[in-house]
Structures are given as C-alpha cells and as structure tokens.
C-alpha cells in the first residue's frame, strides 16, 4: 500500500446514513484594533452578511438529485483573502484555483531549510504497526501571510505532529509550534478575513480552531472526528483544508462526513479574538447506492472542499462526487439539498476544481480497476447544470506507477486554455480545457503527488526524485521547455506556495524549504 494509505487507522464497517442539522444562534462580537504587526488589520466587513435565504427542501436519508440553481456571476480566480496578501488555504480560494503570485524565481537557490538540523518526523501507529513518518505529506501546502512592513509568515503542517509558524524570509520560528497528538497531515487554513485564527486538523482525531494573538498558539475549540457524528466511517484524520465563507467554516473529514460550522468570530473586551463555534450541518459523504457497489467502506473525504454559488462540492475515496446547496444554511437555516451526484468509480482524493464558467474538473486514482473507471477515465470535466448527464469529456490515465496504481493524486491546475495534471505514474500532462485533448506530456520521477502550480506563464512541478521543475508555458499547446530544475534531495509530495519572488515547499525527507533567486 502507498505511504498515504498506511497513514490510515483501521477501517470501520459500513453504517447507515444519518443526516444531522442544527439551527444556529446569530451573534457576532464587535471588531477591535489589531494587535500583532505580522498580520494586517482585519477588513471592516470581516464578518460578512450571509447570503439571502432561498427556499429548498430538507435532505433525506438517501438524498436524490435535482437541478441546481442557475449560476450567478462567475467568480474570479483571485485569493479568498482581500484584507492582506497571501495564500490562506490550499489553492488559495473557494474554487481551488488561486496559485499565488509572481514573479517566480528564475535563478533559484535554497536560502533556508527548516529545521536547519534534523527532520520533521514522528512515529504513528496504524493497522500495519508503528513506523516513522517525515515531512509535510501529500496534502501539505504552506499558508503564506504577508503582514505589515512586508513581514511574511509561513504556516505549515508536519509529520512531527505539529503546526509550525516561520519567518518566510529566514525560516526562523516566529511563534511556538502547536503540538498535536499525532501526524498533522492536512493543509490548514488561515482566516481570510483578518481574524487571528488558524483552522487545522490532526490525525489525533481533532480539528482545531486556534488563536494566534496570544503569546503562543492557543486552541479555542476542537471537533472530534470520532464523536461529532453518530456514525463515523473509515478513519478520523483531517486531510482537507477548510473554507471560510462569511462566518461559516466548511470542512470534510476522513470520518466520511462534511461539516458546516458557524464560527461566531469576534473579540472580547481585552481585544482578544473569540469564537463560539456550533456545528449547524453534517452531511454524509456517501449514500446507500455507493455502499452497495463498493467492495469496502472506504468512503473518506480527503480533499479540500470547493464552493460556488451557494453549492459546496467534494468527493470521497469511494469515488462519489457530490454538490450540496447549503445557501439556506449559510442564511441561518438548517436545511440543505443535494443537487449533484456523480460516481467516478475510483478513489477520488484530489480536490474538485471549479472554473469561471462553473464547470467541475475531477481527478481520480486507479486502484480498484472498476468498469466505471474504464468508462469515465481518471480526469473528467463535469457540468453540474446538467446533473443527469454531466460528463463533458473524460481522459483515461491507465499508466501504472507506485504500488501498481494509476490515475491521479494531485489536484489539477487550470491556467488559460489548459488544464495541467500530474499522475501517479510520473507524467505531467497538458490538455486543452475545452476539449480534453492531450497536447503534450513530460515524464518525471514518479509518483508525482505534488499539485502543479502555474504562475506568470511558468509551471512548477515537484517530483519524487526530489527535483523541483519550472517549465515555460507561454506557448501552451507546445511541449514546454524546462527553465530550471532544483534538487531538494527527497521526494516532493507536497504542493509549493509561491509569493513575492519566493517558493516554499516541504519534502518527504522532513524539511521545509525557502527558495529564492540567487543574488549577484
């Protein structure tokens, strides 16, 4: 089994679906002046008004599919955060299409490694016994926060069981690490509205809301994957990076459930950030139809949820892609409706990506080798406005790589007329987004689980030989020439963050690297 798979705890048996929802209590504390220089002041509208209420029916235990609402104005592939510069979540925004900003270094060198000595490692026990884990994992992408006077903070998960907070220019810690009880597997999310809050999960069952305006990171609230739903399935990790939409947090767990949490962010009379979280909706990532066709109960949600026009999209390890209209919940109600269902036939851990026209791009693995996977391929473009026949095009990725599996772990990247995808076999493939036609492919040292990062006509791709590659994609239909490559000495399975002429990325060797242009 793959390293990612070995991180799982023992699987749980199948269980019936239970859909739970609760009514929220509206209250938001007044904002006060910001205290820490590293962060900019929060925006005046940091606590956004929820969207207007719409009338939608309650979900059923085995929800049916109906037509989604007509999309509104297309979202922009800009960052979720507007009060400050940075990358606050995996792929930067609600549609998972913001990659950072350039310029990209053209003569790169490693200017720091964290830790300077040793590695970010710890032991963890699963069904195969106790073993050592190192690095920042296949889901890891650093948050990068630009504060006052150009200060940059890099926040990253690590397999030493901690979340780390580093000076982006030097790699020195800027605040104490937050230690958890097991692997800190997933990408976390920094509050995009300027509140000094950090939302992060761990393999110790807990998803945490953390205050960053104290002398050290302080857990204000946590959510237990084992006890927060009546019937958790499969596992208790938190791999995905949550989204903050208004005063609500959206997150999927490896316990196979999706959550909407009202945060009630505010400040106390001392000016310290406060939250009063309440789970207002839980939705199963599975249904009876899916469980009936699977040989196992592996239906965990390992991707970072995407959101557009009041609808949240996510997939699971059983290959079920769902869209839930949660606009009523985000307006203070308690009802949601499933408006989209599609089965890929295979484990789908890459995040769903949404383009400006509302199309979905979904990448799946190839491990079960089902007839459905042969039918729809491993890379799909879907139109949720046609829920009964959403498949626009599909592309097969049958080439096998690590552990005898094919398909895709990395999240695809949209850029201009192209979609870029990195495969378990080690291929980096460029396809036309409109037609799904392959235009070129380049073979790298697989498996390539690091997600592609296109910025300013430069495509960054890490490989498992430990090399970061930069390709010139200014002429998208041709095979891109390599601009440079840089060895980091160990498999790059995490996704890099790029901002202000720097790159930050972690490796399986246990280090986090700051990369910048050579001087002189």
Regions inferred by a protein language model and the residue ranges of each:
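Residue-level detector of alpha-helical hydrophobic segments embedded in or interacting with membranes
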Residues: 8-11, 35, 52, 58, ...
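Terminal targeting segments of Actinobacterial cell-envelope proteins
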Residues: 1-13
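Extracytoplasmic/lumenal domain signature
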Residues: 63, 67-85, 90, 97-136, ...
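N-terminal low-complexity, Pro/Thr-rich disordered segments
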Residues: 39-79
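Alpha-helical transmembrane segments of integral membrane proteins
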Residues: 14-18
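Juxtamembrane cytosolic interface motif at the C-terminal end of transmembrane helices
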Residues: 30-38
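Hydrophobic membrane-insertion alpha-helices, especially the h-region
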Residues: 19-31
């Amino acid at each position: 089994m793959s390293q990612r798979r070995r991180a799982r705890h023992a699987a749980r048996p199948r269980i019936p679906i239970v859909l739970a929802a609760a009514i929220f209590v509206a209250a938001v504390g007044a904002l006060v002046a910001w205290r820490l220089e590293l962060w900019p002041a929060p925006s005046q509208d940091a606590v956004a008004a929820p969207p207007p209420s719409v009338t939608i029916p309650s979900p059923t235990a085995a929800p049916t599919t109906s037509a989604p609402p007509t999309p509104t104005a297309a979202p922009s592939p800009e960052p979720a955060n507007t009060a400050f510069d940075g990358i606050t979540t995996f792929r930067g925004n609600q549609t998972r299409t913001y990659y950072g900003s350039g310029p990209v270094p053209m003569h790169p060198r490693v200017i720091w490694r964290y830790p300077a000595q040793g590695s970010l490692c710890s032991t963890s026990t699963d069904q195969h016994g106790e073993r050592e884990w190192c690095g920042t994992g296949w889901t890891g992408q650093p948050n990068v926060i630009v504060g006052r006077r150009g200060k940059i903070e890099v926040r990253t998960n690590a397999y030493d069981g901690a979340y780390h907070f580093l000076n982006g220019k030097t790699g020195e810690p800027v605040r104490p690490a937050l230690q958890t009880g097991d692997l800190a597997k997933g990408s976390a999310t920094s509050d995009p509205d300027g509140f000094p809050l950090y939302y992060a999960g761990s393999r110790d069952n807990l998803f945490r809301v953390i205050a960053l305006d104290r002398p050290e990171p302080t857990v204000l609230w946590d959510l237990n994957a084992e006890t927060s739903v009546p019937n958790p399935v499969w596992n208790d990790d938190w791999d995905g990076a949550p989204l903050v939409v208004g005063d609500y947090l959206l997150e999927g767990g490896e316990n196979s459930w999706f959550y909407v949490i009202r945060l009630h962010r505010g400040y106390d009379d001392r000016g310290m950030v406060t939250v009063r979280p309440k789970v207002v909706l839980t939705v199963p990532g599975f249904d009876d139809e899916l469980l009936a066709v699977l040989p196992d109960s592996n239906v965990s949600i390992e991707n970072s949820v995407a959101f557009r026009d009041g609808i949240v999209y996510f997939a699971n390890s059983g290959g079920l892609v769902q869209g839930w209209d949660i606009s009523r919940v985000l307006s203070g109600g308690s009802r949601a409706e499933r408006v989209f269902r599609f089965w890929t036939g295979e484990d789908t851990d890459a995040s769903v990506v949404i383009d400006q026209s509302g199309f979905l791009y979904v990448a799946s693995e190839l491990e079960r080798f089902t007839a459905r996977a042969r039918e729809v391929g491993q890379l799909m473009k879907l139109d949720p406005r046609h829920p009964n026949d959403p498949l626009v095009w599909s592309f097969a990725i049958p080439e096998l790589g690590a552990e005898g599996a094919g398909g895709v772990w990395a999240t695809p990247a949209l850029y201009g007329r192209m979609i870029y995808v990195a495969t378990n076999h080690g291929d980096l493939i460029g396809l036309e987004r409109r037609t799904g036609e392959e235009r070129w492919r380049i073979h790298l040292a697989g498996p390539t689980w690091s997600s592609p990062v296109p910025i300013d006509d430069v495509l960054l791709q890490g490989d498992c030989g430990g090399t970061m590659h930069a390709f010139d994609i200014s002429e998208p239909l041709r095979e891109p020439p390599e601009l440079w490559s840089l060895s980091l000495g160990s498999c790059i399975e995490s996704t890099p963050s790029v901002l202000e002429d720097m790159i930050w990325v972690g490796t399986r060797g246990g280090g986090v690297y700051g990369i910048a242009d050579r001087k002189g």
